C-alpha cells in the first residue's frame, strides 16, 4: 500500500473515532498535502475541509484528530494552526521501502494509474536540413523523461517528433540543389551540405532577386504534389533524419512517429471547413481569424490573406488527427515558453469548436530558453553549439579523466560514453524547467558537485557496498 493511502486511512479512522456517526463525505487522500518545509512533516491534512460537516473550527478539529491517532509504527500526528501534520516513522518506512525495492527492483516506484489511458508526447521537433543544436536539448530530454515516467506509471505512450518541414525555405533549397548541388555531395555531407546550398542561395539571390521567385515556385510544386519536387523534398528529410539519428542514439532517445507539418498539409481543410460551418471565422485585413477577445487574447490566424494556412492551422489539424488516431487522454507539447500564447490560442480554438476535452487534455509543457555563454543562439551569426559536438567533447573529457585516474579500467570507452553523455543530460534536467539556461562548457562538463557523474559515482559506490555485503534477504 502506498504511504499516502495509508495516511488517508488513518485520517478517516480518526474522524470516525473522534466524531462517531459523522460522514464527512470527503476524499481524504486527495486532500493530503506535502508541506513546503520538511520540518512541518511529511504529509499534512487541512482540517478546514471538515469544518462545515463537523461545525467546528479547524484548530479544534486538528487537536481532536491528533488525540485519536495512535499508530506509532507508522507515524505521529501534530496539530498546527488547523492542519494535522504527519511525521513518518523513518525506521519502519525505510525498512518497508527497502523490502519493496528488493522484491521488485526493476519495477519499484511504478504504478498502474495510467492503465487503459494514452498520452501523446510531442517533443524535440527538429528542423529539416538544419543540424541538431543545444537549443533542442531541453525539449528532447524533458520529453523523453516524461515519456518514460508516463510509461512507468502504466500509460500507453505515443512519442511524436513534429518535424519542422514546411515553408518556402524548402523550395529555395531545391532550387539551390538543382542549380549547384549534386547527390554525392549531399549524401556525404548530410545536413552541412544542405545548409551550404541554402546559404549559397541567399548569397546568389542578393545579386539575382529573381531566384526568390524560383524558390517560391519550387515550394508551390511541393504543395501541388509535383513528383520531382516531392522526391527531392523527401530525400532531404531522409538525409536529415539519418544525421539526427546519430545524436538520438547517443542520447538514448527513440520516437514512435516522425510526422512534421507537411504531414498535416492535406488535413487542414477539415479544420477550416468546420470553423466556417460553426461561424467561428471572421475576416481581418483579408485574412481569416478566430476572435479570442473574450479570452483576452489576440485573434488566432487561420488563413493568410492569400488563402494559405499557417502553423496554427496545421497544429489544429494535428490535434484532431492525433485524437482520431490515438484516442489520447492527454496530449503534451514540450515546447519553449516563447510559444505560450500560440498554444493557448490553439487550445482555446479547439474548445470554441465544441470540444471541451481540450481544456484538460491539451497541455503545453513549457521550458526556458537556452543561450550559449551569455548570448542568444543564432545559426546565421554562427553563435551556436551543435549537440553532436557537445556530446563528443563530453565523452573525450570523461575518457581523459579515466586515463588519468583509472588507466587500467576495463571498457574505458564505454564508461566514458556513459559518463560524458550522462553529464550533458543531467546538466540540462537539473535546472528548474521554466527558467532560462545559459550554457557554459565548464559547468556542463564539471564532474564535481551536483552533476551527472557524481550521481553515477554514488550509484557505483552503492553497488560496491551491496557486493561486499553479499546476499541480503528482505
Please give the residue ranges for each predicted region.
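N-terminal presequence-like segments and adjacent domain-start helices
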Residues: 1-2
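NTP-dependent nucleotidyl-transfer catalytic core
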Residues: 6, 16-19, 25-49, 53-474
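Non-catalytic accessory regions of SAM-dependent methyltransferases
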Residues: 8-12
Amino acid at each position: 500500500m502506498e504511504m499516502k493511502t495509508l495516511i488517508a486511512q488513518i485520517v478517516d479512522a480518526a474522524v470516525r473515532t473522534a466524531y462517531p456517526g459523522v460522514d464527512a463525505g470527503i476524499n481524504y487522500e486527495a486532500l493530503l498535502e506535502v508541506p513546503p518545509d520538511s520540518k512541518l512533516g511529511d504529509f499534512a491534512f487541512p482540517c478546514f475541509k471538515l469544518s462545515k460537516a463537523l461545525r467546528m473550527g479547524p484548530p479544534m478539529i486538528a487537536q481532536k484528530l491528533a488525540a485519536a491517532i495512535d499508530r506509532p509504527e507508522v507515524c505521529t500526528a501534530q496539530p498546527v494552526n488547523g492542519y494535522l501534520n504527519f511525521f513518518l516513522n523513518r525506521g519502519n518506512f525505510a525498512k518497508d521501502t527497502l523490502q519493496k525495492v528488493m522484491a521488485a527492483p526493476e519495477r519499484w516506484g511504478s504504478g498502474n494509474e495510467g492503465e487503459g489511458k494514452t498520452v501523446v508526447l510531442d517533443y524535440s521537433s527538429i528542423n529539416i536540413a538544419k543540424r541538431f543544436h543545444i537549443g533542442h536539448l531541453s525539449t528532447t530530454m524533458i520529453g523523453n523523461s516524461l515519456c518514460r515516467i508516463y510509461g512507468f506509471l502504466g500509460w500507453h505512450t505515443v512519442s511524436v517528433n513534429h518535424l519542422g518541414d514546411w515553408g518556402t525555405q524548402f523550395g529555395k533549397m531545391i532550387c539551390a540543389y538543382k542549380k549547384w548541388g549534386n547527390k554525392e555531395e549531399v549524401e556525404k555531407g548530410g545536413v552541412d551540405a544542405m545548409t551550404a546550398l541554402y546559404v549559397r542561395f541567399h548569397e546568389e539571390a542578393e545579386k539575382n532577386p529573381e531566384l526568390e521567385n524560383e524558390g517560391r515556385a519550387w515550394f508551390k510544386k511541393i504543395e501541388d504534389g509535383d513528383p520531382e519536387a516531392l522526391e527531392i523534398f523527401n530525400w532531404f528529410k531522409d538525409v536529415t533524419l539519418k544525421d539526427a539519428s546519430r545524436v538520438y542514439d547517443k542520447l538514448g532517445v527513440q520516437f514512435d512517429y516522425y510526422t512534421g507539418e507537411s504531414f498535416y498539409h492535406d488535413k487542414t481543410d477539415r479544420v477550416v471547413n468546420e470553423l466556417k460551418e460553426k461561424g467561428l471565422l471572421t475576416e481581418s485585413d483579408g485574412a481569416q481569424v478566430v476572435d479570442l477577445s473574450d479570452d483576452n487574447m489576440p485573434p488566432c490566424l487561420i488563413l493568410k490573406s492569400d488563402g494559405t494556412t499557417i502553423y496554427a492551422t496545421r497544429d489544429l489539424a494535428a490535434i484532431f488527427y492525433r485524437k482520431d488516431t490515438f484516442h489520447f487522454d492527454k496530449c503534451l507539447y514540450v515546447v519553449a515558453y516563447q510559444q505560450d500564447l500560440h498554444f493557448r490560442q490553439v487550445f482555446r480554438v479547439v474548445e470554441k469548436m465544441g470540444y471541451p476535452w481540450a481544456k484538460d487534455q491539451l497541455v503545453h509543457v513549457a521550458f526556458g530558453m537556452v543561450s550559449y555563454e551569455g548570448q542568444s543562439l543564432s545559426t546565421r551569426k554562427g553563435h551556436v553549439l551543435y549537440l553532436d559536438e557537445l556530446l563528443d567533447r563530453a565523452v573525450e573529457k570523461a575518457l581523459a579523466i579515466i586515463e588519468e585516474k583509472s588507466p587500467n579500467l576495463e571498457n574505458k570507452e564505454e564508461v566514458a560514453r556513459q559518463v560524458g553523455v550522462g553529464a550533458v543530460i543531467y546538466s540540462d534536467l537539473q535546472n528548474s524547467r521554466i527558467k532560462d539556461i545559459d550554457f557554459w562548457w565548464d559547468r556542463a562538463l564539471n564532474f564535481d558537485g551536483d552533476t551527472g557523474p557524481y550521481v553515477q559515482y554514488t550509484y557505483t559506490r552503492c553497488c560496491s557496498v551491496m557486493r561486499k555485503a553479499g546476499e541480503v534477504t528482505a
